[in-house]
């Protein structure tokens, strides 16, 4: 079992027994997990849990100012079978997504109309992105842009990565762990779109076209001089939605 030492207190890894408890923690920490430039919409809160082709939530992401995206969110426990449960759920969402587009738009619009603060944030975002109104914005997100998914899970695994890698759906995994000391909790995670947020936090404005190219030496001489000679090896993280 993993442990975390903080301020001379030993925190032990907290095991979530119920998915709803894990999901509540994710929703509470959503601004930190997904970023201040994103809006997490808890669809279950809006319509209940009776419709199986509705994900746990939707994320309207303005990390890329001129290219906002919509992501479906699935909050899962590692105890769930990656093939029969997680993979099949995402496959259902992918298959039904376009056919359910009008209903999804209705859900999102209804949720935004009920929350003034959320609506104002979305409006400011789509105006910056060049959309004339919320209707045109949602039409573009749902019907014109590719579908992306984010699986938030307490413990990732090679099996899960393999399953998600077989889907045509662009999918990211966010591992969200909780450590507990008495009644005190600490959450550990790598933020979604971390590579984008690192640049934003440095005060630079991002454009999608500047993030889709990795430059490497094309000739053997350049490879030997820069990569080997100067030891210029860099680990880069690129989310599936990029």
Question: Language-model features: where?
Answer:
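Charged, terminal alpha-helix-loop-beta segments
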Residues: 1-242
């Amino acid at each position: 079992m993993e442990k975390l030492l903080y301020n001379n207190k030993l925190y032990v890894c907290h095991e979530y027994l119920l998915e709803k408890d894990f999901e509540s923690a994710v929703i509470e920490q959503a601004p930190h997990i997904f970023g201040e430039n994103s809006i997490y919409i808890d669809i279950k809160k809006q319509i209940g849990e009776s419709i199986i082709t509705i994900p746990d939530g939707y994320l309207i992401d303005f990390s890329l100012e001129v290219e906002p995206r919509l992501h479906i969110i699935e909050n899962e426990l590692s105890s769930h079978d990656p093939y029969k449960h997680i993979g099949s759920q995402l496959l259902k969402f992918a298959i039904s997504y376009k056919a359910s587009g009008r209903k999804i738009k209705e859900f999102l619009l209804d949720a935004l109309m009920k929350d003034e603060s959320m609506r104002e944030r979305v409006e400011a975002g789509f105006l910056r992105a060049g959309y004339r109104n919320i209707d045109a914005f949602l039409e573009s997100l749902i019907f014109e842009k590719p579908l992306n998914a984010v699986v938030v899970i307490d413990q990732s695994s090679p099996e899960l990565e393999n399953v998600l890698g077989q889907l045509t759906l662009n999918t990211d995994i966010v591992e969200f762990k909780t450590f507990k000391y008495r009644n005190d909790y600490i959450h550990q995670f790598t933020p979604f779109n971390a590579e984008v947020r690192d640049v934003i936090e440095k005060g630079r404005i991002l454009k999608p076209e500047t993030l889709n190219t990795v430059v490497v030496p094309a000739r053997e001489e350049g490879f030997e001089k820069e990569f080997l000679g100067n030891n210029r090896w860099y680990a880069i993280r690129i989310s599936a939605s990029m």
